[in-house]
Amino acid sequence: MKTITFFKRVLASAALVSVCGFACATNNGKQFIHNDTMEGGKLVCREIYAMNDAASGILNPVKMYKYSYDTDQQKTVKSTYAWNIFKNTWETESRTVISRYETETSVEYSVWNKEKGSFDLSKKYIYITDNNNQLIAQYAYK
């Protein structure tokens, strides 16, 4: 019985290693480079570029993240943009809004709706902690 359990673990480990190998191989040799914009010691914008061919040195925009902070210097909004190669412009993709109250933190994830021109709330998570910042309850809404 112990031998069967051992072989199951070995098989699961081998499967995990091969999945990781396939995931690494899917980038097709692309290198990703990021450009960070800092203000007051805080990251406010990160642009991600792909370098398909290191010899040419040509960078292609992929994603951009913009961050907002509250007066306590805690992150409140993360906006995600994707590069549209046909329009040569950044297009809104999603937004994450973090709201903090005394012992409650709310995280709302919204996806951009092109037809409406606004965000559609996709997921909402609420985390409740005690005075020692230990998690008491977690709620998820879709």
What residue ranges belong to the model's regions?
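Bacterial Sec-dependent N-terminal signal peptides
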Residues: 1-31
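Buried hydrophobic residues that stabilize the cores of well-folded domains
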Residues: 24-142
